[in-house]
Amino acid sequence: MKLSPPASADMPQALPENDGEQRCLNSELWHACAGPLVSLPVVRSRVVYFPQGHSEQVAASTNKEVDAQIPNYPNLPPQLICQLHNVTMHADAETDEVYAQMTLQPLSPEEQKEPFLPMELGAASKQPTNYFCKTLTASDTSTHGGFSVPRRAAEKVFPPLDFSQQPPAQELIARDLHDNEWKFRHIFRGQPKRHLLTTGWSVFVSAKRLVAGDSVIFIWNDNNQLLLGIRRANRQQTVMPSSVLSSDSMHIGLLAAAAHAAATNSRFTIFYNPRASPSEFVIPLAKYVKAVYHTRVSVGMRFRMLFETEESSVRRYMGTITSISDLDSVRWPNSHWRSVKVGWDESTTGDKQPRVSLWEIEPLTTFPMYPSAFPLRLKRPWASGLPMHGMFNGGGNDDFARYSSLMWLRDGNRGTQSLNFQGHGVSPWLQPRIDSPLLGLKPDTYQQMAAAALEEIRYGDPSKQHPATLQYQQTHNLNSGLNSLFASHVLGQVQFQPQQSPLQVVQQGHCQNTGDSGFLQGQLPRLQLHNTQQLLKEQELQQQQRQHVLQEQSSQEMQQQLPSSDHHVADVASESGSAPQAQSSLLSGSSFYNQNLLEGNSDPPLHLHNNFHNFSNQEASNLLILPRSSQLMASDGWPSKRLTLESAVHPEAPSMHPKIEKVNHQGISHFPGAFPPQSARGCSIVQDCRADAENRLLSSSFELQDGMTSIITDANRETDTMAIPLLRYSGADLTTENTLATSNCLGESGTFNPLNNISVNPSQGATFVKVYKSGSLGRSLDISRFSSYCELRSELERLFGLEGQLEDPVRSGWQLVFVDRENDILLVGDDPWQEFANSVWCIKILSPQEVQQLVRGGDGLLSSPGARMQQSNACDDYSASHNMQNIAGNIASVAPLDY
C-alpha cells in the first residue's frame, strides 16, 4: 500500500518532466481502478488543499488516529489555495494499487486578490466510457475454473465472436497498468451458454494474488485496445512493515511541508491514494467556491450524496443536516472540511461518515443564488439580501462580482480577506440573479425614487438642476436629440405646407428622419445648446413670476374664464403669434414632461406659465381646462390645430394634476428626450382604438406602474378624427407604430382611459388578445365575447383543431398559459374570469412536449413577454413597422424585461 512519504522542504519538489511522462499511466485505466467518483484536477489550474483531509488519509492507511501530541502549526490555514503544477498517476508494482503525485504551490497574496480565475488550459483526465467491472466469486478465483463474463458486458466490451465456428471462440490480449500483456481464450459455451475466459485466466489470478471480493475491470478504449485492471477489496493491514515511517512521523512531515510552503510560497509534493483516502482533499477551486459561497444550507435541510457501490456503480443516499460546525475547533478553526454533521436515512448506511463537506452533498432545497434555466421568474417578492451594486449605476455582471467579493476566510486576521471568483471556469455559477422581486422592491419604488428626486430638483439649487437634467436627457443616446429635431422638422413642414394632410406630413417626416441621419448628427450639438439656453431661461422666469402667477390665476378666475360647453378651445398660439416659443417649448419638451408628469403640485398654472410665459391669463386658463363635450379630434384645417400633452392621472391620486402642453401649428410630438428610469413592466402596445366613453380599455401608448399614463391628444373644432402615429415600446426600443384613427377617445374627465394592454377593434369596439401555438399561425381573439373559461377553451379548440384537448389538460397534456400586464406567465383558469379578462395580454397554447420541456427547464420555450410581443406585432404589422424609425430608443429601464 502506497503511503505518503515524509515530506520536507529539502526533498525534491517534483519529478523531472521526462521521468513524469514515463511514469504517467493510461488515464482511463487509472480512473477505472480508482473508482467512479474520483477525478483528478486539471494541471495548471487552481485548487484548494486541505491538510486536515491529508491527515485523514494517513490515519486511514495506518489505522491510527492523529495523536494529540503532534505539534500544531498556527500559521497553516485550514484550506490552502494553490496552483497545481503537476499531476502524475502511479500504480504499485506489487499490488496494482493506484495513487497520484501532485505538485502544489500556494498562491501569493497578490494572486489571491485577482478578480478573475485564469482559464484552465490543461487537458482534463480521461475517464473510461466503455468498460465493465465484476466482483470475483470463489469459482472465478479457483485454479481449475474460468472467469464467467456477463453476456451484456461481453457484447459491449469484447470484440464480437465468430458464431460460424463451433464453439465460437477467440483470443483476447489485454494490457494492465504496467503495460504488461495478458492473453485469454474467450469462448461461448455451456448450458445455458455463457461467455467464459479460460486459458490464461488462472495464470493472471495467481500472478495478481486475487481473492474473492476483489474486482476486475475490462476497458475497450478508442484505439481498439483491451485494457485490464484490478481493484482490491479493502482489507485492514494489521502489521506495518518496519521500513514504513510511523503514523506520527508522517503527520508531522505533511504538516511541516505545507506550513513551510504556505510561508515561503514554495512548491511541495503530496500523494493522493483514492482507495485509501476517505475523501478527496485536493478540490478544484471552482467546485469549492460553488459549494461554499453559492449554496445555502441550514440545519434540517434534506440532501443526497453519491456513494460507490458494487461493480463500480454509484448510488445516491438521502440524509438530513443535523448540525453545521467545525470538526476540530481547536486545531482547525474556521475550516470547511467536514463542517456538516448529517444523519442518514437508511440503516444500511452505518459505514457512512457522520460528517461530510459541502462540496460532497447535493441539497434538495436551495435558493436561486445563480441563474436558473427555468424561464419563469418568481411571482412574489423574496428578500434574498443580494447587494444592489451595479443595479442603478449601469454596472454589469463584472461590476456586481467585483463589488460582492466572496469571503473565503471566516477568520478575519489571516491573509487575504476576499477573493473575487468571477471568471471563465465558474461564470455559470457566480453571476447572481438580478431581479426586482428578489431584491424585495415594492411596486411603487420607482415612483418614490422619482418623487424624491423631483423634490430635490424643485427646491434645490437652480445651478445644479439643469446640467444634470440636460446630461441625462440629451447625452444618454443620440436618439434623444433626434426626436426633438424630428419634431421640429414636422413643425416646419406643417407651417410652410398647410395644404398637406397630417398623415402625409408625418410620413414625410419619417422619411426625412431616415435619410438625413448625418444632418441630424451635425445639428445635435446646436440642439443641445439651444435646449440649455431654453431651460435656463425657463428657470429664471419661474423664479421671477412665481408670486405674480399665484396672485393673478386663482381658482375663481379660472372658473369665470371657462368657455361654455358648446365652444371650443381658441387657437391661442396663432392669435398671440407665439410660434417660435411654442416650437422651442416642443424642443425642450422632455424637461417639461419629466417635471410635470411626476410631481404633485397645487398650482398647475404656474408651470404652464413658465413654459408659455407670453400667454395672457385667459389664454393660460384655456390651456388648463378643456370642455368635456368638445370634439377634440380633427383631420383637416391643419393651421388651426393644437396639440396638447396631458398626464392622465388615476382618480385615487388627487395630488397629481394634469399638465397640458400646447404647441402651435400642431406637429406631432413624440415625447422628445429621454424619460427618467422607470419599470418597463407597465409599457404596452396599442394598434387601434375607437371612441367609447364607457370602455375602460381605451388607453395611451405609455403606462406607468401606478396606472398614470402619458398621452397625445389633438384639439380642433371642425372635425372629429385625425391621424396620430402611435408609439411602441419593447425592451429599450420605442418606435412609431401604425396610425391611430380615433374619434372621441376621451372619457368624461377629458383624458384617455387607462391602458389594459389589449388591442381595440375600431369598427366594433371589441377587445382582442393574441393567441399563439407552435406550428400554427397566431390568431386574434375577442375576449369580451366570452363570459367563462369553458367558452374560451371551446373557441380555442375550434380555432386550432384541438377538440377535447384543452378541457382536460391532465389527460391530454395540453396546457393554456397567458401573460398578464405585469409580464408574469400564469396558467389559464387560476384567476377569476373578470380579473383574467382585464389583465390578459396574450395566450400561449403549450403542447405536451412543450410542457415537458418547460418542466425540465428548457430555455427559450416561453421567451420574455417583451421580446414575444415585439416579434408578434412585427409579424402582424410588418408593413407599418418596417419603415418606421426608432425615435426614442434611449428610454432607460431600471428592471430588465428578461428574467
From Swiss-Prot:
Residues 546-564 have a biased composition (Low complexity). Residues 1-20, 546-586 are annotated as: Disordered. GO terms for molecular function: DNA binding. It comes from the Eukaryota. PROSITE patterns: B3 (PS50863), PB1 (PS51745). The keyword ATP-binding does not apply. SUPFAM superfamilies: CAD & PB1 domains (SSF54277), DNA-binding pseudobarrel domain (SSF101936). Expressed in roots, culms, leaves and young panicles. One of its GO terms (cellular component) is nucleus. Transmembrane segments: none annotated. Coiled coil: none annotated. Residues 132-234 bind DNA. Disulfide bonds: none annotated. Residues 575-586 have a biased composition (Polar residues). Keywords: Auxin signaling pathway, DNA-binding, Nucleus, Transcription, Transcription regulation. It is found in: Nucleus. Interactions between auxin response factors (ARFs) and Aux/IAA proteins occur through their C-terminal dimerization domains III and IV. Auxin response factors (ARFs) are transcriptional factors that bind specifically to the DNA sequence 5'-TGTCTC-3' found in the auxin-responsive promoter elements (AuxREs). This is Auxin response factor 25. It comes from Oryza sativa subsp. japonica. The gene is ARF25.
